[in-house]
């Protein structure tokens, strides 16, 4: 599937680039890569997930054609309150788009187009676990993520078009593990995966511009599986 290929390709690029930089730094023994009390950091990461499918059986429906992408840009900054521990705040923007045609239970072709975007804020705490001299470190980020967003979905049937507009708030409390690889005393590559933990979504929906009959939907869940498909890659500066 396309999104697996994309993530594998990006992951291989990240690892190969990291190895090149690490091989060029021959004097790493003289450098101090530790995250010590009083240090600051700032980072910029990016994630992309895309999927293209044709004539695929997705268990609950037969998909004729599907085209989806989802990306996020995240800026993060923080301060080390003690060795190997930081407190910070991240801000991000995400956008998702999907166009899918599938066969419903009546054998009718249905086309759905959905667009969603949102802004996120998340206070967070990071714990670093140095490996060896600390040029490579395991990162565990705990965060409370709040996303404010909007969505628009249009569903096209043979004799009907339905439009659903939504405003939502997403709350997520959980952990996001990752790795940090320093290629300089101050600069590092960072990669993290999707949050595992508690989530809640509150959304108000308006169907076909009928604002007098708006619906309020509340969803909550617990998921402690690490989402390896949501891979964030970026660069950080420590000073």
Predicted feature residues:
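Bacterial Sec-dependent N-terminal signal peptides
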Residues: 1-27, 235, 239
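Outer-membrane beta-barrel translocator domains and adjoining extracellular loop/strand segments
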Residues: 54-61, 99-108, 150-161, 202-210
